[in-house]
Amino acid sequence: VWAEHSMWVQDPQYALALKGGVTIFHVLPGSANLIGGRGVTVKNLQRNTIQSMKYPDAKHSLKMACGENPKRVYGNRGQAPSTRMGNFAGYRKAWIEAENYLNKIEVYDSKSDEEKMVESPPKRDLKLDTLRDVLKDEILVHIHCYRAEEMALMIDVAKEFNYKITAFHHGVEAYKIADLLADNGICGALWADWWGFKHEAYDMVQANIAIVDQARGGKGCAIVHSDDERGI
């Protein structure tokens, strides 16, 4: 799914956010799925179409999620994943499929015009189109993740399949691996003052953002994302 396909240009929250000084949004799909879909960057302008709000040349993003959300949503339906082990098996399976898809496309593209006349291109797959573009460094990866050990494991998966994680969202335990995040050029989009609402969100410290930002002598990257009760 693509977030831009469900945005409402007349949403009153745009005007409310503008009063608070927010001029640009990055809008992402939700966090119920291992691999949720594409996000988009838009200007906070009064326009009649999403296309006219898009920020010029901004890359799409891919929203992923780890931890309790996907295993709860699918486990409650009697489907996989229902454990954290299942989550990681699902990521790796998807990236293997994406590598194979990319390889088939590259092989086809390398053929001569004469060969292409008699051979059909690989069948298009919208999900794998997005993952392929991540592998080509054309889409930025954003991951909903709370616990330190899971963020570290997600970094392992990214290295296994040679893509980069741009940011972890929420990251209440990011302070525990601040140096690891800095070493890998990964930002934290973190809450300033919200935690404890579920098991994986308990172990927070109020210095979380500062610790992540100042890691490795100031080479870290942390931004504050809203914890406003109105959902902005």
PLM-predicted stretches and their roles:
Residues 1-15:
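Aromatic/His-enriched, Gly/Pro-containing loop or helix-boundary segments
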Residues 1-4, 48, 70-73, 185-190:
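Active-site gating loops and adjacent loop-to-helix segments of metal-dependent hydrolytic enzymes
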Residues 13, 18-167:
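Polyanionic/metal-chelating signatures
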Residues 47, 170-172, 192-197:
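Short, acidic/turn-prone active-site loops that include or flank metal/cofactor-
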Residues 140, 179-182, 186-232:
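His/Asp/Glu-enriched, well-ordered alpha-helical/loop segment
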Residues 148-150, 171-176:
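Short acidic loop-to-helix transition motifs that present clustered carboxylates
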Residues 155-162, 172-175, 183:
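Acidic, glycine-rich loop-and-beta core segments that form the ion-binding/anion-interacting portion
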